[in-house]
Regions:
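Interfacial loop-to-transmembrane junctions
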Residues: 108-112, 142-168
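Core segments of transmembrane alpha-helices
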Residues: 1-9, 57-64, 111-113, 158-163
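N-terminal transmembrane signal-anchor/hairpin module of polytopic inner-membrane proteins
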Residues: 1-23, 176-177, 181-187
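Hydrophobic residues in alpha-helical membrane-spanning segments
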Residues: 42, 54, 158-161, 175
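Hydrophobic alpha-helical transmembrane segments and immediately flanking/interface helices
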Residues: 17-32, 146-158
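Alpha-helical membrane-inserting segments
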Residues: 8-12, 16, 67, 71, ...
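Short, structured coil/loop segments at alpha-helix boundaries
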Residues: 21-25, 165-168, 174-175
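Functional transmembrane core segments of multi-pass inner-membrane proteins
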Residues: 23-24, 28-140, 179-187
């Protein structure tokens, strides 16, 4: 765990120019440090308790918006709108899934983490991050079901997949991931 943590901290310094969601180039490596400082405990807590603490998500959202303001009003507006839409979309999906399945399918912490990601990544970034999260979560869920480690309708933490998506898109930018999806589909 310590080696993974160290690698994540070091990777914050290797962010590509396209990865910072419109932030000034000089700010990119330093902005990644508080982002990983927020994502790492959120992942560990969700893995242990199936819970994403709202105060961490809230502070992450505020810090993401403050840093976005350093890039100017257009970037701040994009990130603010992305945060609001991510929250509303995830809460809507959660409510719809609960109605259809008769049990909760997503925790509201997942919606708050997605909103935090929108504050850091903007609309294009959180869309790519959530696509990665859904893909990774589906792969994990399928593998766990096939191996018998996950029972039907058994809950598993989705926050780590959202955090993974946010971090990967932070490092490379959303365009690179969309290009990889298109390449994978043969387009």
């Amino acid at each position: 765990m310590e080696a993974l943590s160290a690698a994540l901290w070091l990777s914050a310094l290797a962010v590509a120019e396209s990865g910072g969601g419109g932030l000034p180039l000089w700010l990119l490596p330093w902005a990644g440090l508080p982002l990983i400082a927020l994502l790492l405990p959120l992942v560990l807590i969700d893995l242990d308790h199936l819970w994403l603490p709202e105060p961490l998500c809230r502070w992450g959202l505020v810090l993401g918006l403050v840093l976005s303001a350093a890039a100017g009003i257009p970037v701040l507006a994009d990130h603010l709108i992305a945060a609001c839409l991510a929250l509303l979309l995830m809460e809507s999906i959660s409510a719809l899934a609960e109605r259809l399945l008769g049990q909760p399918a997503l925790g509201l912490g997942d919606a708050k983490l997605a909103a935090m990601g929108g504050a850091w990544r903007g609309a294009a970034g959180i869309a790519a991050a959530m696509a990665l999260a859904i893909f990774a979560g589906a792969l994990f869920g399928a593998a766990a079901r096939l191996s018998g480690r996950l029972q039907p309708r058994q809950a598993f933490p989705f926050g780590p997949f959202i955090a993974l998506g946010i971090w990967l898109v932070w490092l490379t930018g959303p365009l690179w991931w969309w290009q990889q999806w298109l390449h994978l589909l043969g387009l």
